């Protein structure tokens, strides 16, 4: 009976893994030092930079809550993730991410699509793909985006729920990412 409950909890834990896409919306001026430090830890150094973190990462919820007035975040879907990796994914030397590179370095025969699936399941964490011997990123953990086509729909000083752009937006982040690619 207890073993069945543990197996059920493991299944629930695997289903609850969400991949957060976090985008810095506001700039560097007048940022509180604590917030600036947290943005640095999240690798969000400039406007329109995007990072991907799993929801199961310890402390990620508290870090996002601290910087909620400078970023927007939500759960990224598979199609948007594949398009993001193809169009904005970079490797060391600022070269574009390709299927051949993923197959060679990570051993994933499905290329970028398989990488996206493993990222969504939480099997691979983008921020941990670092080659310590060569001291280079296998895949850079930061995606540099354009400002959104058509501009922002609301103020970048108000929360998303109040007609602005900041804070949690759930699956609506995918539409914003597609406009910024």
Curated annotation (Swiss-Prot):
Keywords: Ribonucleoprotein, Ribosomal protein. GO terms for biological process: maturation of LSU-rRNA from tricistronic rRNA transcript (SSU-rRNA, 5.8S rRNA, LSU-rRNA); translation. It holds the Pfam family Ribosomal_L30. GO terms for molecular function: RNA binding; structural constituent of ribosome. The keyword Disulfide bond does not apply. One of its GO terms (cellular component) is cytosolic large ribosomal subunit. PANTHER family: 60S RIBOSOMAL PROTEIN L7, LARGE RIBOSOMAL SUBUNIT PROTEIN UL30. Part of the 50S ribosomal subunit. Belongs to the universal ribosomal protein uL30 family. This is Large ribosomal subunit protein uL30. It comes from Hyperthermus butylicus (strain DSM 5456 / JCM 9403 / PLM1-5).
């Amino acid at each position: 009976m207890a073993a069945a409950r543990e197996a059920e909890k493991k299944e629930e834990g695997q289903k609850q893994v969400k991949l957060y896409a976090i985008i810095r919306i506001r700039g560097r001026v007048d940022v509180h030092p604590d917030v600036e430090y947290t943005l640095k830890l999240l690798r969000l150094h400039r406007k329109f930079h995007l990072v991907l973190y799993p929801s199961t990462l310890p402390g990620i919820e508290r870090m996002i809550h601290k910087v909620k007035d400078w970023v927007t975040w939500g759960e990224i879907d598979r199609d948007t993730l594949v398009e993001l990796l193809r169009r904005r994914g970079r490797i060391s030397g600022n070269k574009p991410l390709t299927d051949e590179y993923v197959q060679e370095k990570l051993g994933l025969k499905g290329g970028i699509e398989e990488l996206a699936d493993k990222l969504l399941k939480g099997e691979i964490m983008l921020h941990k793909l670092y080659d310590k011997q060569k001291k280079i990123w296998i895949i850079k953990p930061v995606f540099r985006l354009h400002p959104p086509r058509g501009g922002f729909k609301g103020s970048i000083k108000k929360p998303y729920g109040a007609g602005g752009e900041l804070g949690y937006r759930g699956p609506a982040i995918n539409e914003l990412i597609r406009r910024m690619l």
